[in-house]
A protein has these predicted regions:
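Accessory terminal helices/loops
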Residues: 1-4, 162-235, 240
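A short acidic, helix-capping loop that chelates divalent metal ions and anchors anionic groups
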Residues: 90-94, 145-152
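A short alpha/beta connector and helix-capping loop motif
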Residues: 47-48, 53, 149-158
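Active-site neighborhood of phospho(di)ester-bond hydrolases with catalytic His/Asp-centered motifs
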Residues: 34-35, 56-64, 82-86, 119-122, ...
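Core dinuclear metal-dependent hydrolase active-site scaffold
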Residues: 22-23, 105-132
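Short active-site segment of divalent metal-dependent hydrolases/proteases
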Residues: 65, 69, 126, 143-144, ...
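Conserved beta-strand hairpin/beta-sheet module of binuclear metal-dependent hydrolase folds
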Residues: 1-53, 129-139
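Active-site HxH/HxHxD metal-binding segment of metal-dependent hydrolases
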Residues: 18, 32, 39-116, 197-200
Length: 240
């Protein structure tokens, strides 16, 4: 559990794709949001009940099945709004009466504790992160020493390049990165560690980044991801 001045966070490891979902709550009011409800919710619901937490919101980083496949189940239990970037809402096409479409840099409140949505397209058109205090829930935009795929429907490596640049330029180096999947040797990192060890931060040329993301990366790296110092430090493929 990560704790800061006004907000507490509990991480749950769920599903066959190593998802990490996050329960965030205001320490004073116990108002909570669940980020990317998917797979097995029983441990989450038990934790909420046992700690007298009041779940009031669902926050989505994007609309891929492995991040939303328990939204309907949760809404049967809790009549609460679902927050998603407005571009992603259109891309997804799912209709909820209580769907709230977010602009980038729009604030969300749990009690008096503030979270901010950050539009980070690339993995999907409306992918977003959620920042609060010194933390960034990064969904499938940024993994520890990796980034989200851009070869699925709606993916765009040019947009991913811009999104990573925006994170690098607009967040403090000690920001804690909380990814949507546990694909690395570490569960979390700081932005400073990502800038120094994530190969996707080492590009200043868009064309080279696109080539690496779309063609070279999956041939030269394997999970769990470890830090790489410079683009040259990648595994050479073995040929028969």
């Amino acid at each position: 559990m990560q704790v800061n001045s006004t907000i507490s966070v509990k991480t749950f490891d769920v599903g066959p794709m190593l998802n990490m979902i996050y329960l965030i709550w205001d320490k004073k009011t116990k108002e909570a949001a669940l980020v990317d409800p998917a797979w097995d919710l029983i441990p989450v619901l038990d934790f909420i009940k046992n700690n007298n937490i009041n779940l009031t919101k669902i926050l989505l980083t994007h609309s891929h099945h492995d991040h939303v496949n328990s939204v309907d189940k949760l809404l049967h239990l809790h009549d609460i709004p679902v927050y998603i970037n407005k571009i992603e809402a259109n891309f997804w096409g799912k209709k909820y009466d209580n769907l709230i479409e977010l602009d980038s840099e729009e604030n969300i409140y749990l009690g008096k504790s503030k979270l901010t949505s950050v539009h980070t397209p690339g993995h999907t058109p409306g992918s977003c992160c959620y920042s609060f205090d010194n933390n960034l829930i990064a969904g499938d935009t940024l993994f520890v020493f990796g980034c989200g795929r851009c070869d699925l429907h709606g993916g765009n490596p040019e947009e991913m390049y811009k999104s990573l640049k925006n994170l690098k330029n607009n967040f403090h180096r000690d920001t804690i990165i909380m990814p949507g999947h546990n694909y690395s040797i570490h569960r979390q990192s700081t932005l400073e560690e990502e800038i120094n060890g994530n190969p996707f931060f080492n590009f200043n040329n868009l064309k080279e980044f696109v080539k690496y993301r779309m063609h070279d990366h999956d041939k030269t790296r394997e999970e769990p991801y470890a830090p790489k110092i410079g683009r040259a430090h990648v595994r050479t493929p073995v040929t028969a």
